[in-house]
């Protein structure tokens, strides 16, 4: 599984800018993972749906998570249905996106701002990939910082499975 990080705004996740008055500047974070086998997709889904132990998740807050698809099996089925009949042996079958903002973002304290952030993130993914290629999304609220996870089949404008056209 290959992982690439792209910050939508500066600074890097390691450094937080201090503004006048001591306020910390928040930033958006976008991470992608190329999933090249059904085993990798299944492993990601088991973490995402909490069907395996997830030490970094607070089990008391897990019921606050939201999934667009009720089960990991339905997500896997949706991915398989969207894939072309034949794929290259080294093809990226699915791209897992993680979209969040830094913990300092004041929007985490406001349910309306949080909902708008995730709504706009999903709209961006659907615009970039096509709504039919965004198979499922989840919002995790049981970890340190809320985040959206999306499973996307990287079908390009020509109808070909082509992660490179989206991720480089």
Give a label for each model feature.
Residues 1-168:
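N-terminal nicking endonuclease/strand-transfer module with a His-rich metal-binding environment
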């Amino acid at each position: 599984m290959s992982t690439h990080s792209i910050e939508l705004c500066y600074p890097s996740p390691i450094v937080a800018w201090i503004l006048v008055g001591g306020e910390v500047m928040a930033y958006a974070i976008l991470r992608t993972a190329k999933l090249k086998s059904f085993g990798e997709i299944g492993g990601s889904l088991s973490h995402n749906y909490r069907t395996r132990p997830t030490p970094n998740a607070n089990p008391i807050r897990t019921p606050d998570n939201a999934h667009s698809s009720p089960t990991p099996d339905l997500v896997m089925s949706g991915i398989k249905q969207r894939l072309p009949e034949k794929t290259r042996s080294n093809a990226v079958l699915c791209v897992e996106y993680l979209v969040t903002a830094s913990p300092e973002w004041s929007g985490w304290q406001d349910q309306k701002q949080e909902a708008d952030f995730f709504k706009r993130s999903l709209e961006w993914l659907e615009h970039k990939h096509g709504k039919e290629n965004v198979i499922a999304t989840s919002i995790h609220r049981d970890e340190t910082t809320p985040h959206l996870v999306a499973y996307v089949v990287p079908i390009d404008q020509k109808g070909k499975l082509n992660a490179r056209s989206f991720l480089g």
